[in-house]
Amino acid sequence: MEQEICVIGFSGGQDSTTLAVWAKKRFKKVCLVGFDYAQKHSVELECAQKIASLLQLPYEIISLDFLENITRSALFKNSNDLMGYSHAQNKDLPNSFVPNRNAIFITLLHSYAQKIGASNIALGVSQADFSGYPDCKEDFIKSIEHALNLGSNTAIKILTPLMFLNKAQEFQMAKDLGVLDLVIKETHTCYQGERKILHAYGYGCDECPACQLRKKGYEEFQANKK
């Protein structure tokens, strides 16, 4: 176990929950930080709080509700955009993309890490099995790590252990870590905030892009077990 502090960008979803357990086994102290940016699936914040309690890890929420005033995304509560279409500002991206969201998140996590003396930040981003978001790719993460460290005269590492894992491999990772049941029953992925229907892969509407990706990953995970 490293005698260091690690800050986790924590949403209460499959990726960040698996990541939190991974980090808990490797660092002396792990701090979870979530963001309230007026997302439709704000129920994830409630799930995040519960998961943090179950994992016995400190959890803080940073309010970023101003985001919906300066950019556009189908993820915002007040958006009338329907999921599954191109972004109004960039046709090459899905309309669930929030421009510069991860850049803002990472910048704030970097500041928080400096405040508490953490030398590591861990993110649950992946470019192997993602929703078409360019700010989840390795080249972006490496670039912003370099820029933020230059701008603050620090050497904080941004760790992305899920970067090249698909959802099926993440389910396997959760199983190996002993938290598969927790990931299925307690984490939240659905963009619509559906928490009434429990599928084999977890709660969700079974229709939005996030649910479809998670469902596909779970089915592949199950198939690989046979």
Swiss-Prot record:
GO terms for biological process: queuosine biosynthetic process. Zn(2+) binds at C190, C205, C208, C211. Its cofactor is Zn(2+). It comes from the Bacteria. It catalyses: 7-carboxy-7-deazaguanine + NH4(+) + ATP = 7-cyano-7-deazaguanine + ADP + phosphate + H2O + H(+). Gene3D superfamilies: HUPs (3.40.50.620). SUPFAM superfamilies: Adenine nucleotide alpha hydrolases-like (SSF52402). Binds 1 zinc ion per subunit. PANTHER family: 7-CYANO-7-DEAZAGUANINE SYNTHASE. This is 7-cyano-7-deazaguanine synthase. It comes from Helicobacter pylori (strain G27). The gene is queC.
